[in-house]
């Protein structure tokens, strides 16, 4: 249902291309979209019945902004910029990077080959990415042996060890002719582009010779080299009749979800494939979600553009090609059309599997979280945050925060807090101070950084923790976030939520959850997770401080020497096991090393 503000703004919408930013009650941008006609697109959110994820979005919209542009290309680029800036909840968020390594030939006066996960526009040559990291490492070592460039750190006035082994051209002690480097680089590029027949034949002969001479370890080593070369360079059968680097995109839509399949063709082989699936915010225009995904996909760090992108029919290929700066084509027949159809079949297969798993998992995640919000009489929220404290008789106090989004842990958002100072002993006052400090630090920072607030805070404790948390939120930070306590029974088992709104005349009361419900299981899981996280952090901190204290008690070992030992060995056990020479290698003098051995 559109508010009066939205109704008034809808009348002023222009019939121009551009982007729109949907905002919630807090003014947070929750969705960014683009359209060739802003008037028609934005009005469609409020003038027709919505279902699925789009219905959820519309229920949360309280305002919107628009930005007009001149062309579709500008709308594409602006949409990606806005999504990166605001990271809206209802937009698909792509993870950065592939996680796979590349083999790089560096662009330097004395070039070298190396593995890297970062692709830069520095004029170097990049090959990959390679899904099998171990095979990529082994292939790199093979290249460095057979096609040497530079393996040392550069000129040092004398030949390096690798030069004597035939794995360095000698930049360590002389000027290597550029022609020599160019010839080697040409061979490496030919090898990594799939021309490996001669190399394989040579290795096979050497393996057979080693076997005939009963050098079985050497034969096995060569056999492994052949296997790794096949993993990285020759992994797939040839499925194309040219060597053009291509990425193939196709998609399938069902039940307000889109599944996108990507095939990566390199050296005429299917190197690997990826599948991405996400719920559609605008079910009426899946084509827009598909093209936006492609632009975002190549906007990620370490994504290397191919020479050509293939997509199905029905899209503005010219605009997409202009945005990506590579040709975008739609094959009509032949082998490329077959690959495009295969990508769609795979997208459908993956989505069908997803639905079967969703039916099982949704009851335990999003459905379970809804049960908690329903029990508290709150509208559904996506983010729950929970705190717990840990210390031993007041020593080394810490707090931990866990975050659950739609019923699942978001471990990238977990946080650890070293509490300032030490408390004398554990009592209610200490819990109050710990709670106030960590709540102030957490949500004060979110305010300063204009980050999204959680929809519910669960404190691991009773009224003391809830009151302390609400006092800081409302009276210091001017925030109105619902806070509930997870209350345990006399057997230390969670059995109720403590919730209310005393400021508005609603006293705190115990709210039971059905012990057999998914909501109860989720609450227990959140409490177990925050307790585990806090205890683990405290144990590590306490062990580290105990080790520091033990070292500080040794005469002649000051803070600098202590830190050297901690960096080198990490634990008291390893320091005890270290020899005097090992201790000296860590940076201690001979008398210091002897004293440490004697005292420990």
UniProtKB/Swiss-Prot annotation:
Residues 15-92 form the GIY-YIG domain. It comes from the Bacteria. It is found in: Cytoplasm. CDD domains: GIY-YIG_UvrC_Cho. Keywords: Cytoplasm, DNA damage, DNA excision, DNA repair, Excision nuclease, SOS response. Its main location: cytoplasm. GO terms for cellular component: cytoplasm; excinuclease repair complex. InterPro entries: GIY-YIG_endonuc, GIY-YIG_endonuc_sf, GIY-YIG_UvrC_Cho, RuvA_2-like, UVR_dom, UVR_dom_sf, UvrABC_protein_C, UvrC. Residues 197-232 form the UVR domain. One of its GO terms (molecular function) is excinuclease ABC activity. GO terms for biological process: nucleotide-excision repair; SOS response. Pfam families: GIY-YIG, HHH_5, UVR, UvrC_RNaseH, UvrC_RNaseH_dom. The keyword DNA repair applies. Interacts with UvrB in an incision complex. Belongs to the UvrC family. The UvrABC repair system catalyzes the recognition and processing of DNA lesions. UvrC both incises the 5' and 3' sides of the lesion. The N-terminal half is responsible for the 3' incision and the C-terminal half is responsible for the 5' incision. This is UvrABC system protein C. The lineage of its organism: Bacteria, Bacillati, Bacillota, Bacilli, Lactobacillales.
């Amino acid at each position: 249902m559109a508010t009066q503000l939205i109704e008034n703004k809808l009348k002023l919408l222009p019939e121009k291309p551009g982007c729109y930013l949907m905002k919630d009650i807090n003014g947070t941008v929750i969705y960014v979209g683009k359209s060739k006609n802003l008037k028609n697109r934005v009005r469609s959110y409020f003038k027709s019945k919505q279902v699925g994820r789009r219905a959820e979005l519309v229920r949360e919209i309280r305002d919107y902004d628009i930005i007009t542009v001149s062309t579709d290309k500008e709308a594409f680029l602006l949409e990606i910029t806005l999504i990166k800036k605001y990271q809206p909840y209802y937009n698909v968020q792509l993870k950065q990077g592939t996680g796979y390594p590349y083999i790089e030939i560096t662009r330097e006066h004395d070039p070298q080959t190396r593995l890297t996960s970062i692709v830069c526009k520095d004029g170097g040559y990049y090959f990959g990415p390679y899904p099998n990291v171990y095979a990529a490492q082994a292939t790199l070592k093979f290249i460095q042996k057979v096609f040497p460039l530079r393996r040392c750190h550069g000129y040092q006035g004398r030949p390096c060890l690798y030069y004597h082994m035939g794995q360095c051209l000698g930049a360590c002690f002389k000027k290597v002719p550029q022609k020599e480097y160019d010839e080697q680089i040409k061979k490496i590029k030919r090898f990594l582009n799939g021309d490996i027949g001669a190399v394989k034949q040579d290795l096979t002969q050497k393996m057979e010779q080693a076997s005939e001479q009963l050098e079985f370890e050497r034969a096995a080593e060569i056999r492994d080299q052949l296997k790794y070369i096949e993993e990285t360079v020759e992994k797939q059968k040839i499925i194309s009749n040219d060597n053009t680097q291509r990425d193939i995109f196709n998609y399938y839509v069902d039940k307000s979800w889109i599944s996108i399949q990507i095939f990566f063709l390199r050296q005429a082989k299917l190197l690997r494939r990826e599948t991405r699936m996400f719920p559609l915010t605008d079910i009426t225009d899946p084509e827009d979600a598909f093209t936006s995904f492609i632009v975002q996909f190549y906007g990620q760090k370490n994504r290397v553009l191919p020479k050509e992108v293939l997509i199905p029919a029905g899209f503005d290929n010219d605009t997409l090609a202009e945005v990506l700066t590579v040709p975008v084509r739609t094959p009509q027949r032949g082998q490329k059309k077959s690959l495009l159809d295969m990508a769609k079949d795979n997208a459908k297969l993956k989505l069908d599997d997803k639905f079967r798993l969703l039916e099982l998992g949704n009851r335990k995640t999003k459905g379970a979280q809804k049960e908690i919000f329903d029990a508290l009489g709150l509208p559904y929220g996506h983010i729950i945050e929970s705190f717990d404290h840990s210390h031993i008789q007041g020593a080394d106090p810490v707090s931990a925060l866990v975050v659950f989004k739609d019923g699942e842990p978001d471990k990238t958002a977990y946080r650890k807090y070293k509490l300032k100072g030490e408390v004398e002993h554990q009592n209610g006052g200490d819990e109050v101070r710990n709670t106030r400090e960590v709540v102030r630090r957490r949500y004060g920072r979110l305010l300063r950084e204009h980050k999204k607030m959680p929809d519910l805070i669960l404190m691991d404790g009773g009224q003391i923790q809830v009151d302390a948390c609400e006092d800081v939120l409302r009276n210091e930070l001017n925030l109105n976030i619902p806070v509930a306590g997870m209350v345990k029974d006399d057997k230390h088992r969670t059995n109720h939520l403590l919730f209310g709104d005393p400021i508005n005349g609603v006293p705190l009361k115990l709210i039971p959850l059905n012990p057999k419900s998914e909501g109860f299981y989720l609450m227990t899981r959140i409490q177990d997770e925050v307790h585990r996280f806090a205890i683990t952090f405290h144990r590590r901190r306490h062990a580290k401080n105990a080790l520091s204290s033990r070292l500080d008690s040794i005469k002649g070992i000051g803070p600098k020497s202590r830190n050297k030992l901690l960096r080198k060995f990490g634990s008291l056990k390893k320091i005890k096991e270290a020899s005097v020479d090992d201790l000296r290698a860590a940076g201690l003098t001979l008398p210091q090393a002897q004293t440490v051995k004697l005292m420990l």
